[in-house]
């Protein structure tokens, strides 16, 4: 994905295309440096702004962290 025009608050923050378990694709701000194939958790809505280093960033989806291990019962 190439995004040349952004709102001022996004600056040079990375953006990632995420796919949920139903196949829906969304774009999220990525302050943690996730890579393709990583499992991540996200913050959405107004909480997404506070997951960014600068809470003034205008976003409604932010990657909050990379999941290193996940066990499902």
From Swiss-Prot:
Pfam families in the record: EutN_CcmL (PF03319)
Q: Which UniProt keywords apply?
A: Bacterial microcompartment, Carbon dioxide fixation, Carboxysome, Photosynthesis
Q: Which GO terms describe its cellular component?
A: carboxysome
Lineage: superkingdom:
Bacteria
Domain (BMV) ranges: 1-68
Name of the gene encoding the protein in the UniProt record: csoS4B
GO biological process, alphabetically ordered: carbon fixation; photosynthesis
Please describe what this protein does: Probably forms vertices in the carboxysome, a polyhedral inclusion where RuBisCO (ribulose bisphosphate carboxylase, cbbL-cbbS) is sequestered. Has been modeled to induce curvature upon insertion into an otherwise flat hexagonal layer of major carboxysome subunits. Has not been identified in purified carboxysomes; it is expected to be present in very low amounts.
State the domain notes. The tight homopentamer forms a pore with an opening of about 3.5 Angstroms in diameter which is positively charged.
Disulphide bridges, residue numbers: none
Q: Identify this protein by name.
A: Carboxysome shell vertex protein CsoS4B
Family per similarity comment: Belongs to the CcmL/EutN family. CsoS4 subfamily.
């Amino acid at each position: 994905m190439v995004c040349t025009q952004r709102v001022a608050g996004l600056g040079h923050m990375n953006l990632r295309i995420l796919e949920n378990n139903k196949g829906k694709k969304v774009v999220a701000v990525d302050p943690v440096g996730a890579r393709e194939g990583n499992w991540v958790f996200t913050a959405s809505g107004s909480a997404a702004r506070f997951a960014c280093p600068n809470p003034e960033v205008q976003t409604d989806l932010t990657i909050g962290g990379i999941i290193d291990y996940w066990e499902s019962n």
